[in-house]
């Protein structure tokens, strides 16, 4: 369990991203948690996540070489989405999800459920 009880958390997924949405979410929820491959998306847009959670099947090896100090929570099971893994493994004051829609339909439907 990753604990950010005093903070709001922005969860970043690997779907469609409006950078202004991410900037605004981080103003409200400053701790950024990347769901798997969204770690690369965060770096590409100038953000370093506090942690990466997921099955790690989408994040680049280069990311972990350059950011080895970050919290990594590797869950290999394939029964749930990386967003679900984030929600189950972070204890925060509140959470905002960005980038969980518009990529894979199965993940999109799970995020809406």
Task: Describe the role of every protein-language-model region.
Residues 13-24, 38-41, 45:
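N-terminal active-site wall of soluble small-molecule enzyme domains
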Residues 1-16:
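N-terminal nucleotide-binding beta1-loop-alpha1 segment
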Residues 1-3, 31, 44:
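Short secondary-structure boundary/capping segments within folded domains
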Residues 2, 23-26:
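Glycine-rich helix-loop-beta junction characteristic of Rossmann-like nucleotide cofactor-binding loops
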Residues 7, 25-33:
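Short beta-strand/loop segments at the ligand-binding rim of alpha/beta enzyme cores
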Residues 28, 37-113:
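Acidic/Gly/His-enriched mid-domain segments of enzyme catalytic cores or analogous surface patches
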